[in-house]
Amino acid sequence: MSGFSIDHGGAISVDPDALRTIARRIDLAATRCEVAAESLASAHRTIVDTPGFTEHVDTVALWAAGHGASRLFEECLETAESTMLMADAYEYVELKAQADALALTDAAAAHDLRRRMAEMAAADGRVPELAEKLVHEWEQRRFGGLEPPYPANMIFGPLVWAAALLGASPRFGTVRPGSTLSGKADAVTIAPVATSSPKAPPTSLAGSLNRMPSASGAQVAVEKYSYADGRTKFVAYIVGTQTASMGGTQPWDMKSNRELYTGSASASYQATVDALTAAGAQPGDEVDVVSHSQAGMIAAYLSTASEFEVKVQIAAGSPTQVMGGEGQTVVGLTHTDDPVAALSGGGLPGGAGAPDSFTVTREADPDAGLDYTVLGAHGLDAYIETAEMADASDDPRVEELGEFWDELSKAETIERTEYRAERVEESE
């Protein structure tokens, strides 16, 4: 397990509020150490000043205990203060990322966030300086592990780094709130190729990735969850790129990759929307998404550009990072040696989505040698293995995702349909 981590995304390694909770607990411990130091010092004075007491008490050890408690008080106090400062710096990074995103859709809200940033900077000038340092350090390490090992790096290295640098551009790699797709997608047709009634929903990250379409040629699986109170919700499982061609009947191709990455409507996106509609999803319905590779971009734009309400999206190896809203849980799985994931530019400097959102990161194959394949770290199986590691962790955000699985389990019926889509080629 090389470099395995679960964090809130980018420079944000923990939730600022959680960090403040820790700081307050450390401060409470400091207070108790201070009380203990004062009590020990008082006891030492009393014993020393009282004739005959020193014969029965080791005053040297007592003084050392008091001195140790005093030093521990100072260390705890300093740690609490520095932890609170770090929490402010992390929040500052998040506020800046949110303000930059909202500038496109809600200038007033962006102004309010920048005003909050100004207040934090005025209260403690160290906050913006530390925030800038955090982002700088994140930028330096975000592509760590991406360079393939020798001798593959002689062939693929330049391609991988070109992809990473393209993703680092402010124009690409990030889907901001309110983002829409330009142009018109190629015409597609869809057809159901398999139906089933699963007995239970997925109960874990790995379990959700294992529910990708399995019928021959299927690219989208839609599960409809119906509840006793009449509610319905949908979960879409969308595969990644299926061919390296730049056109043809397969919508999940490099043409769709290029279109989605540059913000244009693609045949694969249109096919996904059509599949959801065919499964019964209507505007305003909750549609949650589990995706791999190219489908991560489809999921991102479903959350910002479609008429569906996307509350949870799980993306493995996505070329883009979505800046989800406060009410949206965004879960990303990224391998630092995955050149496709590198197109996201290393993710976002601030956290994405709701506080319970998280990013799982690791180097998929740190021991790769002569048998290295540039897309090995991008494979779905490798990401399922990463998801299993996350499921086995005790990270509270992974545990909170359990509420999503629990809600799905309350459905009375589950109807699953897998769809195959084809691009309609223009007649000559």
What are these regions (language model features)?
Residues A61, A118-D285, E307-E428:
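Alpha/beta hydrolase fold serine-hydrolase catalytic domain that processes acyl esters and thioesters
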Residues A23, Y269, A295-G296:
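Short, hydrophobic/amphipathic alpha-helical packing segments
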Residues M1-R114, M120, E428:
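N-terminal secretion-targeting helices of virulence/extracellular proteins
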Residues A29-A43, I47, G167-A185, V289-S291:
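Short secondary-structure boundary segments
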Residues M1, Q294, D337:
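Single, functionally critical "micro-switch" positions that shape active/binding sites
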Residues V290-A300:
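Gly/Ala-rich beta-loop-alpha elbow adjacent to hydrolase catalytic centers
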